[in-house]
Amino acid sequence: MSRFDSQCSSEDVNKEDECVPSSSEDSQDGVSSPMENDDEPEFSQKHYDIEPCYYSLTGKSDRNCRGIVYRYRQDSDLKGFQSHDGTLYRLRDSVFVEVSQNEPYVIAAICGFKYTKRDHVVVKLTRYFRADDIPEISLNLMKQERAELEINPHLCPQSLNRELFNSELQITQPVSCLRGKCIVEYVKDVRHARTVADFSLDNDTFFFCLHYNQDSTKLASTHYAIRVGTSFQATLPPMAECSVGDDSDRDELLYRPNSIESGEEEDYIKLARCYRTYTLSGNHMLDSQKNARSLQVSDLLMDEAIIQLHRSGYKIDDALSELNANDIILTTDVDNMTQDDAKKFAKGIKQLGKNFSRIHRELLPHHSREQLVSYYYLWKKTPEATKPKQAARRVNPTSIKRPTKEKVKASRPTSTEYLDFDSASESDVENNGPSGRACHHCYGAESKDWHHANGLLLCTDCRLHYKKYGQLRQIANRPSQVPACLFKRSNSDEEESGVRTRAGKKEQRRRTPSSMSETPDRRSPSTVSNGAPNLTAEETPTKKLNGSVKRAPKRPLHNGVINNVEKSNSSEEPASPTTPPPTLTNGLTNGHGPESSTPNGETISKRMKVEPSYDDDDDEEEGKMTIDEGDDDPMPVLNGFKKEESVEEIKLELNGTIKKENGVETDPTTPTCSMEAENEVCETPAVVSVEIRDETNGETNSDLKDDENVEPDSPEDTFELGSNVEFETKNAMFVRSIVRSCGPRCARTDLIFKIKVGGVWEKSIKEKEERKKVHLQNQRIQDSEKVAIQQNQIKKEQQQSQPTPQQIHQQQAQQNAQHLQQLQQAVMLGHLPPEVLRQMMPPQFGVDPTAILMQQMMAGQQSQGVNAAFQHQMALQQQLEAHQVQFQLMMAHQHQQKMIAEQQQQQRHAAAQQLREREQREQRERERERQHQQQAQQALHQQQQQHAAAAANQLNPAMMQMMALMANSAASQQDIARLMEMAAQQQQQQQQAAQAQAQRDQERERREREAREREAAREREREQAAREAAARDQAAREHAQAVQAAAAAAQQAQALTPDMQHMHLLQQLMLNPALMMQLQQAQAQQQQQQPQVTNPLQMLQHGMAAQSANQAEMMRRIHPEPAMRPQHQ
């Protein structure tokens, strides 16, 4: 039964209506909304007011757009919105919302529309989550559940990608973010998703069946159903046919009680504990380990002892032998930690944490990882591990440098092979031409606009598909060849005007953009021939330079000319995208084109630098040759030399000597260095300057025109391996290794150099090898000596660590003597009976049981006399202590009575003081009431007088009218009587009003007086309750003290048992060694004075008499006489 059973009913609820948020468009007061009436058009002017609204779109030339908002007249709520493109958005519609330009659309359901404070229309939405928005943990749980139910095989990848997750998250966005409507269908089960729509088509249809709670990050079903059926029932195992009695007993019996007598069992456990305590006492280990192992002497030892006794067949001798052997193994454990090891372990824990493998490898190699782990649980309870840490230093938050802009890490690495273009409008594309851009997904060159999405530049169709569905669309007829504009040209070896030396001291040469396209950073494909490996779009050629792998700089060549010159004519239109990219051969063309615009008289100068190196650290880079291209004037070179021109003169600068060989002239410009003085060869640059001049024209012209048309190498061009020596130096020979049919190309590709036999370089190499051999031989000798020394040290340590037979015998003798002494002490103290001692004595201790028995009997007879004297002394001491206890109790009772009397007197004083304060307070209240009454009477009298005066001064309007008539004419008797009657009525009314006012004042005063009396009564009740509680507490304390005193008296009155007296005497003797020595001396003197008798009974009697006298004297010295003690009165 699932957890949704209690929430289910007989009728399923339409969860689609529940999950989609409800809004105020529902009908009110039972009247249906006009939107639901089919007889009238939707949003008719009969029920709705149409209001225009204006908003702006980003990235458009016509930013201001005009839309329409529909307001319902009955409740003045916004029910719909029509955008500038004619899309009508209603409540509960599912829409696409653009939150970010580079991310997919957010799918949400419309809850309502409203105006902001600035009269901008915004839409309230309830968001759906995609699978990429759900946490990985929740998504994995869902996938695991579906895999168990075998749901995934029923769906295709497109269907799973269209799945959404409903939520209750409310968001608000402006209407300018709406990007169209979609359909979100609810399905009860994911297996029914196919019935909703065909998700392989771009029909803007999605489905959902689960609800996502953002607070708990959990996915739950939106459709509650009772899970009944075979799929949801547990598989019950078959009923067991055998009974419990048939099953074999798997418990192991460790001990069977009542197998031996209880006394023997207790003695056996005492002996085992004594053996282990003695064994651990002589061990040298850390306190933490000793404390941990001493726990095994307590209850754990008892368990181990009885288990071993059961395994030995309840033979006490065999069990003790096994336990003793285990104790010896326990003390000789090799994993004990020394103080230095403990310090290293604590240092490793603080620095490396609980990485016990590293601690074992770096700090404690002689301790295994298991030993370190077990020691850690002991170490962490020590004070060193539990001491508080130092307070961390506070860091000023203002000093921390924070990034000015947060960088969001992409979910997947973005390919660096594609170009990054800014957002562009349709007009920008037209200006750039059709070859300016291409889609990174479908390789299309035509699009309405270009925008970034998922880190790629996409066309309109690919971008909208990605924004809607969160994935790139499938391309049926995708071109197999990547467009040229999607590649970024790599820098080639020929791009730099000079090659870096091994030391890296050459400055980076000036680079110019390529003439194939206007964007120098764009990539173009290139195919490599003549034996060079083919490189794909994602591969980049690398080379090894100075021992490290670096990116090989490469740039294209045009017409066999190194692109070292800026483009002269920038107004030429680029090649169309339909033109195939030029085919390059080994980074160079044929060396000459059909239209050669290079005039005669150009000068080309190259410097060749030969750097011999004899460092011990780098053997592979001996005698490197690098060629430095001159960067004074950018000169085009065809295959290393101009084919049409002749080499007139080559200047070779080498070792300061001037030679002339085959047109090569040397001049002394480079200093020499002595090899014998420094044992090294200086870097001697050999500068080869090739100057090519034309006799007809000596002027140079660097204005070149780069043509877009590049011809590939001729298929007839061939090359072969050669061995001709081009020229020689003092220490090297330059050999042309590649002979091309089209002529020489470049010295870096066609020439190699070899070390000349008998030269300085060869000698230095041989000397270097000899030095290496000598160094290696010396190092081997030193290593062998170190190994021999280490082996000798190990042998010495092993010899020192192994004890000699004399030492072993001496240690065993000491251990036997100590153990025998302990057993003798135990026998003398009377802890072990003679029969048990004879049975339990281990065979390795050579002690005569008869002698031990005699000693025990004599000690027992002597102890009887000592016990009698001690009992008499203890009786006297008990009486004195009883008197002292009674006196102390009497004094304590008197002191307690005195304290109680003082407390009662203080309480009486406090009660009298409170009574006086209450009487004074009541008197002040009565005085205050009397004053109030007097003031009230005075005020009433004054008020009456004022009323009378006012009545006398103010006449009734009727009387005023009557007096005016009487002034005009003579007054009659009736008028006078009437006037008098009116005056009497007025006076009577005033008297009644004064009486009513007086009654009200009296009633108010009476209520105030009653309230004060009630407050005083409550105060008296609280005081009485406090006094009663204090009395109860005092009585309880007195009763407790009396009970405690009685218990103490009863405890002191109890007499000491003989065993307690015996133990007390032994304690006194052990605490006072001087008394023990005196007792032994007295016994020796008594034995010397007594006559020699052969009867052992007489010897025992004499010994007992002397021992009793000595014990009496000793007790007198230990306890002073009663007369000497101070008497308490």
Curated annotation (Swiss-Prot):
Molecular-function GO term, any one: chromatin binding
Domain ELM2: 224-327
Regulation: induction: By starvation, heat stress, oxidative stress, and UV stress.
Residue intervals of every GATA-type zinc finger in the record: 439-485
Native source species: Caenorhabditis elegans
GO biological process, one term: regulation of cell migration
Designated name of the protein: Egg-laying defective protein 27
SMART domains xrefs: BAH, ELM2, SANT, ZnF_GATA
Subunit structure: Interacts with ceh-6, sem-4 and sox-2. Interacts with wdr-5.1.
This protein's GO CC annotations: nucleus; NuRD complex
Composition bias type Basic and acidic residues, residue spans: 915-932, 1000-1040
SUPFAM superfamilies cross-referenced by the UniProt entry: Glucocorticoid receptor-like (DNA-binding domain), Homeodomain-like
Pfam families to which the protein is assigned, alphabetical: BAH (PF01426), ELM2 (PF01448), GATA (PF00320)
Biased composition (Acidic residues): 419-429, 613-634, 705-717
This protein's domain notes: The SANT domain and GATA-type zinc finger are required for conversion of the Y rectal cell to the PDA neuron.
Feature: compositional bias, Polar residues: 1-11, 525-545, 561-573
Localisation: Nucleus
Biased composition (Low complexity): 22-33, 899-914, 933-950, 983-999
Residue ranges of every copy of the BAH domain listed in the record: 87-223
Residues annotated as domain SANT: 332-384
Keywords: Developmental protein, DNA-binding, Metal-binding, Nucleus, Repressor, Transcription, Transcription regulation, Zinc, Zinc-finger
Free-text function comment from the UniProt entry: Transcription factor which promotes stress survival and delays aging. Required for cell cycle progression and development of the mesodermal and endodermal embryonic lineages. Required for normal T-cell polarity, for correct migration of QL neuroblast descendants and other cells, for embryonic patterning and for the embryonic expression of hlh-8. Also required for the transdifferentiation of the Y rectal epithelial cell to the PDA motor neuron during larval development.
Tissue specificity remark: Expression detected in anterior intestine and head region.
CDD domains: BAH_MTA, SANT_MTA3_like, ZnF_GATA
PROSITE patterns reported for this sequence: BAH (PS51038), ELM2 (PS51156), GATA_ZN_FINGER_2 (PS50114), SANT (PS51293)
Disruption phenotype: Shortened lifespan and reduced survival in response to heat stress. Impaired differentiation of the Y rectal cell to the PDA neuron with the Y cell remaining undifferentiated in its original rectal location. Double RNAi-mediated knockdown with lin-40 results in delayed cell cycle progression in mesodermal and endodermal embryonic lineages, but accelerated cell cycle progression in a subset of embryonic lineages.
Annotated region (Disordered), positions in chain: 1-43, 388-434, 488-636, 693-717, 790-814, 899-950, 982-1040
